[in-house]
Curated annotation (Swiss-Prot):
The lineage of its organism: Bacteria, Bacillati, Bacillota, Clostridia, Eubacteriales. Belongs to the Lgt family. Keywords: Cell membrane, Membrane, Transferase, Transmembrane, Transmembrane helix. It is an enzyme of class 2 (transferase). The keyword Secreted does not apply. It is a multi-pass membrane protein. This is Phosphatidylglycerol--prolipoprotein diacylglyceryl transferase.
Length: 254
């Protein structure tokens, strides 16, 4: 699989960056639609995005580097090279949400109103972004038989044939799951006015899918013998259930 999309002079533009940019652009278009559903300010959303996006990129990189520091110890300058991947979504979510919380608190705007609107866009970006992993030949699962992989389209078979072995296209599993979540979240955004429900549903549903898919991957980040993504996913599921229960319980009081 060729990771290079095209060249600008001597500069190679990788598919990874092109796909991340595409996911971001489509996420912003979806947010415009979702802001109308909730009657939220799209201008305020863009201001929030301009703070959240770089914060998320920094967080995603730092999170990855912390757990893979041995790969960078002897060449620290490579920490700043993200063109070949090395972004951990959990770090991006944590840093991005924290930046948004601080910004909206400063602006005296409702945190949950805007993260509810953002949730479908975030998961859409993740669904599209996983295809960047495909072109980088990363984030795949363990070895599979030719008979198993033959059930997938030919281009998936070709991309998952790495150094003489076929691998689970886990990027595809997560991408499909994320697209399903995106559709559900847009539906939920239309159906409920309870602030926080949509965002916490995003956290819970993404965590649920990621927990199972992570078990198939061969490139997981570890904390001792524990897959970090699975640990964070369990915490995400618990957190979402706790918040959704309390949001609904609070609404019933009034």
């Amino acid at each position: 699989m060729n990771p290079i999309a095209f060249h600008v002079g001597n500069l190679a533009i990788r598919w990874y960056g092109v796909i991340i940019s595409m996911g971001t652009a489509l996420g912003l278009l979806l947010a415009m639609y979702n802001c109308k559903i909730r009657e939220a300010s799209y201008d305020e959303f863009i201001n929030m995005f301009l703070i959240a996006f770089p914060s998320a990129i920094i967080g995603a990189r730092l999170y990855y580097v912390i757990f893979e520091f041995e790969d960078y110890r002897d060449n620290l300058i490579n920490i700043f090279n993200t063109r070949q991947g090395g972004l951990a979504i959990h770090g991006g979510i944590i840093f991005g949400v924290l930046a948004v919380y601080i910004y909206l608190k400063y602006r005296k705007e409702s945190f949950f109103e805007y993260v509810d609107v953002a949730a479908p866009s975030i998961i859409l970006g993740q669904a599209i972004g996983r295809w960047g992993n495909f072109f980088n030949s990363e984030a795949h699962g363990g070895p599979v038989t030719k008979e198993f992989i033959s059930k997938f389209p030919q281009f998936i078979q070709n991309g998952m044939f790495i150094e003489g072995t076929y691998y689970h296209p886990t990027f595809l599993y997560e991408s499909i799951w994320n697209f399903i979540i995106c559709i559900f979240l847009v539906y939920l955004l239309k159906k409920t006015k309870k602030k926080g429900i949509v965002f916490m549903a995003y956290i819970g549903l993404y965590s649920l899918g990621r927990f199972f898919i992570e078990g198939l991957r061969t490139d997981s980040l570890y904390l001792g013998s524990i897959r970090v993504a699975q640990l964070i996913s369990v915490l995400g599921i618990i957190l979402s259930i706790f918040f959704i229960y309390n949001i609904i319980k609070k609404e019933k009081r009034y």
